[in-house]
Amino acid sequence: MTELARLKFYATQPHPCSYLPAEQATTLFLDPSQPMDVLVYAELSEMGFRRSGDHLYRPHCQQCTACIPARIPAALFTPNRQQRRILKRNEDVSVHPVRPAFTEEYYDLYVRYIEQRHADGDMYPPSRDQFSTFLVRDLPFSRFYEFRLAGRLVAIAVTDVLPNGLSAVYTFYDPAEERRSLGRFAILWQIGETARLGLGAVYLGYWIKNCRKMNYKTQYRPIELFVNQRWTLLT
């Protein structure tokens, strides 16, 4: 176990919540001068922390506990009928891991995704600097999983490979391929890859009951939620 007591953390001032517009949010960050050590990262992921760019963070709101860390235990997961259909529908998609990088191919896909799927969000409008700062980090455990259909890039799953599982950082995909449900397929693939690697779980970030955009996470069962400082299994 890493000696977490020696680590420093900093809390932000209250700011508008990205998920619940009526709420003010506070975020707890690991000291940015602390090297991004994979063992520290893995241990903090067990406590609900996530990575964004070069920072590890988790919600630290005083009056709200709506953001609940969620993970899928890979060894226990069984796809339901709809998920099996998604897997079948995408059998012709190949997946390859590469190191994070900025390419025009990646950025073009990212722009199309943000403009068509998240034009109402705080990541709009997309920019090259935003893409690089958020996703293209030179970290030894970070991967871009390329999803290709007959050689054509249709999705990227930005994923951190940790000793305790895969952390699904961000996924973006071709909005023209809506029939394929590529976002859901990426999660199903990550669950399968976690099992193939003999790791524990896929860390999906935060589930928020009253946020419609987060509802998809509880479609993967069983799921574990981090509540009252412990992981609780829901079947």
UniProtKB/Swiss-Prot annotation:
Q: Tell me where in or outside the cell this protein is found.
A: Cytoplasm
- Record-linked InterPro entries: Acyl_CoA_acyltransferase, Asp_Glu_LeuTrfase, N-end_Aminoacyl_Trfase, N-end_Aminoacyl_Trfase_C, N-end_Aminoacyl_Trfase_N
Q: Name one GO biological process term.
A: ubiquitin-dependent protein catabolic process via the N-end rule pathway
Which top class of enzyme applies to this chain? transferase
Q: What is this protein called?
A: Aspartate/glutamate leucyltransferase
Pfam families from the xrefs? ATE_C, ATE_N
A single GO cellular-component term from the record reads:
cytoplasm
Question: Chief location of this protein?
Answer: cytoplasm
E.C. designation(s): 2.3.2.29
